[in-house]
Amino acid sequence: MKKTLKKLLGLGLTCLLLASCEKASNDKTEGELTIGVVQVADHPALDAAREGFIEKLDSENINYKLIDQRANGDLSLIPQFASDMKNKKADLIYTIGTPAAQGVANTIKDKPILFAAVTDPEGAGLTGENITGVSDYVEAGKLIDDFLKLYPETKTFGTMYNTNEQNSNVQVEALEKALKERGLKLEKQGVSSINDIPQAITSLKSKIDAMVTVTDNVVVNAMPVISEALAKDKIPSIAYDEGSVRNGALISEGVNYKKLGNQAGAMAVEILKNNKSIKDLPYEKADSLTTLVNTNTARTLGLDLENEIIKNADKID
């Protein structure tokens, strides 16, 4: 009897310990927030927007655990990610890229949603009561004007973009308008995947004097291939993001996506730490734009590094 009682007591203690461990592993620590991140695809600009957001949270000593989800371009996964975050009672969801923001906003109505790397929030329907963020819209005109100081004889620009990506369509329309106002032409080539890039480059190269790369997920991911192909024919390229310059484009005058993430992170701090209502935080544009030149590409193209535009820009080699 004593042995049986001892076994039962031992078993009960074991069960109690196991239950306690399970609770500890499943529960949040006291005061800990749950923050979800949904990123539409992996590429340098979006990765930097994620990094900047987390950096800002950490600098403000926010106590949180992260649910980090990446769709890798498969948009059907985004509603699943949103449902998972809803079930896990995320306190705030940070979305990177328009499809990510739209997919999460369609599912979650009662928690704050922040976006970054969204070009046209209003056109994308991202103006609800529980959503705000930072737009990466870039005015094409100044970038074109600065480029023309390097290549004044340029008449025809080319661009590749995914016609199914809303951000890309908005940017290309604005680019075409800016070029038309300056009496310049734009040759457009649609692509649906990275596999379309080589043929698109071949089709464009004989028609253009320069290439413009908007922040299109397909195109930005293929930038090393694009840069190499353009360099062979001494065709210069302009980019809307710094990551593309790091991957061989000549010049960008656009968004620093890490700083964009910092800016979105500051909005998260206002909501989570300072108890600001998301309704009182209208969406913002990027605080500042940066001119970045790839000097290795500039040398390949035979440009004078003492040119005023290059001299005054931030530079990488």
Segments and roles (model prediction):
Residues 32-54, 60, 67-76, 164:
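Extracytoplasmic "Venus flytrap"
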Residues 35, 53, 136-182, 282-297:
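An alpha-beta-alpha
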